[in-house]
Amino acid sequence: MVQPAYVGSRGFTSITALARTQWVDLEGAPETTTISFDTPIGKNDNMGIGLSLFTDKIGPTAENRITIDYAFAINFIWSKLTFGLKAGINEFEIDYNRLNIADDNDPLVQYNANKIQPRFGLGIYFNTEEYYLGISAPNILETNYYDELNIENTSFSNVSDRIHFYGMAGYVFDLTPKIKVKPATLVKIVKGAPLQLSLIHI
């Protein structure tokens, strides 16, 4: 979940699972699995907690992540402002045995790139009965994966997990008393990459 302030905002317990496999039957094909849980807590459901599990495998690399989200809402007459925190652990590893090594003396092969890093994120979410908007950064701690290897002035010396910023906004249209349409926009900003814009209809 990219917006920690959203946990528990739906007013009921939610469990979501997603599994995605690309290029089936191809060795080293990307595989992604996510499982998330969130629920409202507190006397007036003004708080929420969530738990997310994430695994991603591509070729010789694997990434495992577990995060906990907490949200606290301030209720107004016609709206609600929610602040969210995210904390967790991320594990990144490379299995060089799955590669065809041309040079056993390659310094990159001799380097243990396996890393366990903390994650910490923030989010703000504002919503009414008609519209909502929010901003978040799921992880504000940058990770340099090859910082301990003396390979300056190479492409590997710049391999890092940079901070991702997300902006979201949406509006609720009542088509009938029982049917609602929720078009939304999600913007993703990362330093050094083009701005990404997604339109979502719910």
Task: Enumerate the predicted regions with their spans.
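Subset of outer-membrane beta-barrel
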Residues: M1-H201
